[in-house]
Amino acid sequence: MVKEYDYIVIGGGSGGIASANRAAMHGAKVILFEGKEVGGTCVNVGCVPKKVMWYGAQVAETLHRYAGEYGFDVTINNFDFATLKANRQAYIDRIHGSFERGFDSNGVERVYEYARFVDPHTVEVAGELYTAPHILIATGGHPLYPNIPGSEYGITSDGFFELDEVPKRTAVIGAGYIAVEVAGVLNALGSDTHLFVRKDRPLRTFDKDIIDVLVDEMAKSGPTLHMHANATEVVKNADDSLTISFDNEETITVDCLIWAVGRAANTSGFGLEKTGVELTERGNIYSDEFENTSVPGIYALGDVTGKLDLTPVAVKAGRQLSERLFNNKVDAKLDYTDVATVVFSHPAIGAIGLTEEKAIAKYGAENIKVYKSSFTPMYTALGDNRQLSTMKLVTLGEDEKIIGLHGIGYGVDEMIQGFSVAIKMGATKADFDNTVAIHPTGSEEFVTMR
């Protein structure tokens, strides 16, 4: 017997949860399938535990670098990593509980088993068949290992969250968000951490002026940055340490190797070939601006599509899809332009819109004007452990519409959200100039640049 629903959601990550709940709120009969822990990458091995670890690193930096400058004579007797890990997991467990309460409140049925397509509108789960006119694929992605000898001796970001102690010596290989964040956390928690990137700087999609500040801060406080370094081999030694070789003839021996060299979409293992759904050249599921795949009635969003691998993007896309399918908002869709983002580096980076380089490439240098301010945040200014903060506005045309806003420094991670609203609304430099600053704050620099 086939069980009938209005909406089947395959994947219990951020996008799937958001879409399932919104559809049920509009009266749809919804069932969600997830073979792992509810919450997906973000809650279990991504944003949430990463941010907890970043906060732990912030506490360490405060104690080691700034407490003395504020007059506190601090003696650190011990750092118990097990306590941090246990409290982190307890926090995640509470989030799991909130998801379950939300499902119950909205009437979302769920089965914590893997689903598998048997045809474009039917899935099999634990021997039962389920069908619906609308099926969402929100299966997320997974971290990759490089194809080099010995790569299996390293771990990925998933394995980072399984560590039971801070490694004495760590190599992090990669140049994106995950690599920079993990390396920064381990460095702050006391590991001798080395970050290896293949090209001339990490976070190459971010504004160069901002990343230059990050690179300078790494040179002062760590992690040790190695550029133009592409790993070629990993050897496991008799004492379980790892020796990594690079194409620039550099070698390093560490206790822990973390790969952060990219992610791939989860498109196998659930019968996708039975549907006829098309994949992109990169192996992601193709979906259009309305999250439609190539097969009517099947939709895809989040990391499995490779559009923007950010949790709030998946959440918003999922809700908009359900508004369109179950609340008669036929034009509802996510605007993927001007999405703000933050890197929880040390110090944090925030950005929305075009970098200076991309703005010039798109509109021509003659149409772009850039404003920039650099200063020492007050929190770090009392003693010798000063951090630089840089903020930047990229404007277009005579009316100086702000098409890019970028910052690095203490507190930037909490500043960027409010400014992103202004950018989405089309704010100009004059709008910022006409805004009275809040003093003394770091964010006032964005509205006082000349």
From Swiss-Prot:
It catalyses: 2 glutathione + NADP(+) = glutathione disulfide + NADPH + H(+). Its cofactor is FAD. Gene3D superfamilies: 3.30.390.30, FAD/NAD(P)-binding domain (3.50.50.60). Keywords: Cytoplasm, Disulfide bond, FAD, Flavoprotein, NADP, Oxidoreductase, Redox-active center. The active site is at H439 (proton acceptor). One of its GO terms (cellular component) is cytosol. Glutathione binds at S14, R319. Its EC number is 1.8.1.7. FAD binds at S14, G15, E34, T41, C42, K50, A115, D303, T311, H439. InterPro entries: FAD/NAD-bd_sf (IPR036188), FAD/NAD-binding_dom (IPR023753), FAD/NAD-linked_Rdtase_dimer_sf (IPR016156), Glutathione_Rdtase_euk/bac (IPR006322), GSHR/TRXR-like (IPR046952), Pyr_nuc-diS_OxRdtase (IPR001100), Pyr_nucl-diS_OxRdtase_dimer (IPR004099), Pyr_OxRdtase_I_AS (IPR012999). It is an enzyme of class 1 (oxidoreductase). The keyword Secreted does not apply. Binds 1 FAD per subunit. One of its GO terms (molecular function) is flavin adenine dinucleotide binding. NADP(+) binds at A175, I178, E181, R198, R204, G262, D309, V342. One of its GO terms (biological process) is glutathione metabolic process. Disulfide bonds join C42-C47. It is found in: Cytoplasm. Catalyzes the reduction of glutathione disulfide (GSSG) to reduced glutathione (GSH). Constitutes the major mechanism to maintain a high GSH:GSSG ratio in the cytosol. The active site is a redox-active disulfide bond. Homodimer. Belongs to the class-I pyridine nucleotide-disulfide oxidoreductase family. This is Glutathione reductase. It comes from Streptococcus thermophilus.
